[in-house]
């Protein structure tokens, strides 16, 4: 068949524009496309929620791609292996309780699982601010193109209305810190004091699930952002806690959606 370059342009512009407009109102906006939010997005979408992931970078997956120090392998504890099974991620036992998976396969299948379930992904779209209403409750997000943010260009953003936001932005806990910076007297965990603690894998893995909660009205925190927001230790290239945190975030969000 003959190809018309203009039709190609129109197809891309038309279809993406329709999707963007359709997702100006969502049930849950997940900020950051790391493993916790990918897990949360899948389970939310499977439950019928309208969800979108906003990732500033070109690719999703957070720090999982590189495994440990660019060795593309990750470790997962036994209690999280059921989530690997759910996504069809292969793994093998290294020692009792320690399971190893290929980091690249893991990210690919997490992304596939989330999108196949119906989660929409907006990569190269950065979070800039939250929308608030009565009592300063979070009711939406403010977004811009990722390159605009990186280059610090003076371009006004656009807004997305959402019932809930999940901060899965990793060590920086970007959404949490934005609220602390811009809403007077806002209280979010221990942010503004110490932030994330140094490495302690065992404790960090335990606390990341405990720290996954609605940390501010309309905002759930998950993954490494949860540890940062609650002054909990980092854990390195062991990802069971990340996966379980995403699962818990989805359950919490579904419970909250029923209340709204």
UniProtKB/Swiss-Prot annotation:
Its EC number is: 2.4.2.59
* Cofactor list: Fe(2+)
**One GO MF term:** pentosyltransferase activity
Positions bound to Fe cation: 156, 171
Q: In which residues is NAD(+) bound? A: 36, 55-56, 63, 154-156, 224
Q: What assembly does the database describe for this protein?
A: Homooctamer; tetramer of dimers.
| Protein name from the UniProt record | Thiamine thiazole synthase
Which source organism? Methanosarcina barkeri (strain Fusaro / DSM 804)
Q: What is the lineage of its organism?
A: Archaea, Methanobacteriati, Methanobacteriota, Stenosarchaea group, Methanomicrobia
Gene transcribed to yield this protein: thi4
């Amino acid at each position: 068949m003959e190809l018309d370059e203009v039709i190609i342009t129109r197809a891309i512009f038309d279809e993406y524009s329709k999707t963007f407009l359709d997702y100006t109102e969502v049930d849950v906006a997940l900020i950051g496309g790391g493993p916790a939010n990918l897990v949360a997005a899948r389970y939310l979408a499977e439950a019928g929620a309208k969800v979108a992931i906003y990732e500033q970078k070109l690719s999703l997956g957070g720090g999982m791609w590189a495994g440990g120090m660019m060795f593309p392998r990750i470790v997962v504890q036994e209690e999280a292996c059921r989530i690997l099974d759910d996504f069809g991620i292969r793994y093998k036992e290294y020692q009792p309780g320690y399971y190893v998976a290929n980091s690249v396969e893991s990210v690919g299948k997490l992304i596939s699982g989330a999108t196949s379930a119906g989660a929409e992904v907006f990569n190269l779209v950065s979070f800039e601010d939250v929308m608030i209403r009565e009592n300063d409750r979070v009711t939406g997000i403010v977004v811009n193109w990722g390159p605009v943010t990186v280059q610090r260009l003076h371009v006004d953003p656009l807004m997305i209305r959402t019932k809930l936001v999940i901060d899965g932005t990793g060590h920086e806990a970007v959404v949490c810190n934005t609220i602390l910076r811009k809403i007077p007297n806002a209280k979010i965990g221990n942010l503004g004091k110490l932030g994330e603690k140094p490495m302690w894998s065992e404790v960090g893995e335990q606390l990341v699930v405990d720290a996954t909660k609605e940390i501010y009205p309309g905002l759930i925190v998950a993954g490494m952002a949860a540890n940062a927001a609650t002054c909990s230790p980092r854990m390195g290239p062991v990802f069971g806690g990340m996966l379980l945190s995403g699962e818990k975030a989805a359950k919490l969000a579904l419970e909250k959606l029923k209340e709204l």
